Amino acid sequence: MLPHPNLVSESLLINSTIDLLISVGGSAPAVEVVDYVMRIRDPHPDFARMLVMDLINRDPRLSLVDDLVHLTEPDHNARGLEEMGFVVFDLETTGAKAPPCRVIEIGAYLVRGGAIAAEFHSLVNPETSIPPFITALTGISDEMVAASPVFGEVAPRFLEFVGDSVLVAHNAHFDMGFLNHEIGRIYEDYRLGNASLCTVQLSRGLLPDVENHKLKTIANHFSVPLINHHRADEDARATAEIFINL
């Protein structure tokens, strides 16, 4: 059973099914999927449907219509920019690499129609100690997160907030990697299926003449205040305003 609508499976069977469907144009008979992916030769159609339904129930990218398995990737072009939601987010963590490091704070802002429409913020108990240099950088201490929810308690609320929005972050590779690592700890073999954008990459393409593309530099370029740098809520708000200006 799919744990949340905007999660996609990382299981070998499902990824093999998706690779097969991509290679044949997006759809294939259930019996062929079972034959190719599960190595069950000449399965009975009813048996093939049953096996395929198990895959479909675990991943929103797959569907079954009239014994044909279809790849149903979301069409982001079907919605105009005014209708599309963008969740601009930032994480603070116990270090630079996951694993072993963990998330200690999440800040996020929903941008719709060129304006901030909603916000999300939570400290997160990492279930491990916060290194002194991270406390010095962020101001977040072990005492501050001791009574905070663990990621497993924050995740359902954050996933609900994100919905089917496009995720945006400054250095998205880092933040998406950490976020998916934490999600994989809670929902084994799953990751976020949302499309993502990186404001570092966007600013490099749109602002080639700025000194560098660090958050503070781009914030200064657009006169966006960044008072409490290296806190997730403040960095996410500044990134959201930068994204709106870009």
Predicted regions and their residues:
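N-terminal accessory regions of nucleic-acid-interacting proteins
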Residues: 1-84
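Conserved non-catalytic scaffold segment of RNase H-like nuclease domains
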Residues: 72-76, 82-184, 190-193, 208-226, ...
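Conserved beta-strand -> loop -> alpha-helix junction used to position metal-binding or nucleic-acid-contacting
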Residues: 191-203
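Short, glycine/acidic-enriched loop or turn micro-motifs at the edges of active sites
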Residues: 93-95, 201, 238
